[in-house]
A protein has these predicted regions:
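STAS-like cytosolic regulatory interaction modules
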Residues: 1-54, 66-125
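Helical "lid/switch" subdomain of P-loop NTPase nucleotide-binding domains
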Residues: 59-60
Length: 125
C-alpha cells in the first residue's frame, strides 16, 4: 500500500501543505479536506508542495482546480511547488497539468522559499 501524507507548516502569512504519495481518486478527498480546513481557519495564502507526489490522476487535478477556485473566492492566493527538473524533464504532476492545458492556471514555484517570497517570480508556464 502506498503511503499518502499531507503535512501542514506555516511560513509567515503562508500555510504550506506538503503532499507526498499518489494524488488520485482514493487520496484526493484527504487533500480537499485539508485545503478546506486551512481556509476555514482564515488562512488564505496557501502553498501546495507537490514535489513528492509521483502520480496524479484527474481526481487530483480536480482538487487542485477546486482549491484554486476556493482561494480565489476569498481573495486568497494558491501557489504550487513542482520541481523544475525531475522525472524525465519535469515532475509527473507538471506533465499532467500541461497535458490537460491547465498548468497556466497556477502560479508554480520550484521550492517553498521562492513560493513564499513576495519578490520571487513563478516559473514560466
Amino acid at each position: 500500500m502506498v503511503t499518502f501524507t499531507v503535512t501542514d507548516k506555516e511560513h509567515g502569512e503562508w500555510a504550506v501543505l506538503r503532499v507526498s504519495g499518489e494524488l488520485d481518486l482514493m487520496t484526493s478527498p484527504v487533500l480537499r479536506q485539508r485545503v478546506h480546513d486551512v481556509v476555514a481557519e482564515g488562512r488564505h495564502s496557501l502553498v501546495l508542495d507537490l514535489s513528492e507526489v509521483w502520480f496524479c490522476d484527474s481526481s487530483g487535478v480536480g482538487v487542485l482546480i477546486a482549491s484554486r477556485r476556493l482561494l480565489r473566492s476569498c481573495q486568497g492566493n494558491l501557489r504550487l511547488i513542482l520541481p523544475a527538473r525531475g522525472a524525465a524533464d519535469g515532475s509527473h504532476v507538471n506533465k499532467v497539468l500541461g497535458a490537460l492545458g491547465v498548468r497556466r492556471l497556477f502560479e508554480i514555484h520550484a521550492d517553498v522559499p521562492s513560493a513564499v517570497d513576495g519578490n520571487s517570480r513563478p516559473l514560466s508556464a
